[in-house]
Amino acid sequence: RVSVPKTELQKKTDDITKSENHLPELTIPNLYKEIIRNGILYPKIVLAQAILETGWFRSSVYRNKHNLFGLTNPRTGKYYEFNHWTESVRAYYTKVQYKYKGGNYLLWLEDIGYAEDPKYIIAVENVLRGL
């Protein structure tokens, strides 16, 4: 077997590699690493979104459905339910960020109507300042 040198990103995310019996607990560092591991752009903004959407991981949507971003099914309007919070991170990419084509990310979130709150971007910026 040939040994391939690890990239810096792989080295940084090794400590959250998943196995069948071990999934990382939800902490700010683990969430940030999982966001990066999934190739999500603007990881600090996305981290701030998760904190804001869940009220620092206390919301019922997070506790009952492991949904960090308040993602809803456009057909039913119901919140997506995940088996583990890491699935919610992947879903953020596959349901939201894949549409991003460049430019100011916060303005893009506003343009696509990511949140119902007209002051959502200001709230995200406030969380970002505290990180």
Which residue stretches match the model-derived regions?
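Catalytic cores of secreted/periplasmic lytic hydrolases that degrade extracellular macromolecules
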Residues: 1-131
